[in-house]
């Protein structure tokens, strides 16, 4: 069975930068270990990077969330340091929106796809739902121990919403 691990937005700004949270910091080691295990198992590895530019505050998202973050090529835009060594041999998708619309084509040959990362209630749920919509016969899973939301409550609500849409929550 061909498997993939999708790592959503494990970027400095979401961990200890402008939108960082203690919960995001707390999952870094678990995500790094999950990535290491996936690489050792020969799984396909995909990273997404939330990618904005200097005009972010003038965008629709910037008007609703007026906090500059993940401005390419700032330090905050970069992947957390523990994951950088793994990115060189992975697929890395820059995305200007919550969902990486090109993501399904990169994992269409996989039967089991696990999603981890940040933020559970925004980009993780968006990409998990995108994958489920485009690849309805694939097993789409979200490892809740390797995700964090904007708040613990919104993290839990997002996991419940994904369960309702037949996404397996681990």
Language-model-detected regions and their locations in the chain:
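Short, conserved acidic/polar surface loops in the N-terminal third of protein domains
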Residues: 56-60, 103-105, 126
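Active-site acidic carboxylates
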Residues: 1-92, 141, 150, 156-163, ...
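Internal catalytic-core helix/loop-beta-alpha segment
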Residues: 73-122
């Amino acid at each position: 069975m061909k498997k993939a691990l999708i790592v959503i937005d494990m970027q400095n700004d979401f961990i200890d930068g402008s939108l960082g949270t203690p919960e995001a910091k707390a999952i870094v080691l678990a995500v790094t270990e999950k990535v290491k295990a996936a690489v050792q198992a020969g799984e396909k590895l995909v990273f997404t990077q939330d990618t904005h530019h200097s005009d972010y505050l003038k965008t629709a998202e910037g008007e609703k969330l007026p906090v500059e973050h993940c401005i390419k090529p700032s330090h905050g835009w970069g992947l957390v340091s523990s994951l950088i060594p793994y990115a060189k041999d992975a697929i890395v998708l820059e995305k200007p929106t919550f969902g990486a619309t090109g993501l399904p084509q990169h994992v269409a040959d996989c039967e089991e796809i696990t999603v981890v990362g940040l933020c559970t209630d925004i980009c993780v749920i968006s990409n998990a739902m995108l994958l489920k919509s485009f690849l309805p016969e694939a097993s789409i899973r979200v490892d809740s121990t390797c995700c964090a939301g904007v708040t613990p409550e919104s993290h839990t609500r997002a996991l419940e919403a994904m369960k309702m849409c037949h996404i397996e929550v681990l």
